[in-house]
Amino acid sequence: MAKATQAVECFHSGFNCAQAVFSTYSEEFGLDKETALKLSCGLGAGMGRLGHVCGAVSGAYLVIGLKYGQFQPNDKEEKEKTYAMVQEFSKRFEERNGTTICRDLLGVDLLQDDKVFTAERIKEVCPKMVQDATEIIEELLF
């Protein structure tokens, strides 16, 4: 199954956007799926429904960190590689969607706007964000 399809199915099964993207790749990098789902849970809906950076984007940043992230204090090269990949991911995501900001992608304030309308916008918009994030990860990392 294609990674984008897998991630979108994960989202439709009840997990948030960040969980869907991050957990799709976690086991490839030695992190079990349960831990990945727990770690990324608070990042959904733009950081806990705050509408900040899109959770699919945050999930992708975590995947980039698993592949390239610095784990030695003096390894500046890995840190710079990670930052460069995050910047390139963001550029490509913005080219597709205009922004990486959740509330702008959805066109709603997740904490203030009508809950029924917000839920409909999430169903309409977020699967595409999950798919786009996953496709960009595939382009950049594999």
Language model feature labels by segment:
Residues 1-29:
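Active-site-proximal helix-loop elements at catalytic-domain edges
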Residues 43-62:
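Glycine/serine-rich anion-binding loops at beta->alpha junctions
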Residues 23-27, 62-69, 135-139:
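Short glycine/serine- and small hydrophobic-enriched flexible loop segments
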Residues 82-142:
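C-terminal binding/interaction regions
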Residues 1, 15, 19, 33, ...:
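Electropositive phosphate-/nucleotide-binding environments in soluble metabolic enzymes
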Residues 20, 57-67, 83, 91:
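Mg2+-dependent prenyl diphosphate-binding active-site environment of isoprenoid biosynthetic enzymes
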Residues 28-38, 66-85:
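Phosphate-handling active-site elements
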Residues 24-42, 104-109:
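Acidic-glycine-rich active-site phosphate/pyrophosphate-binding loop
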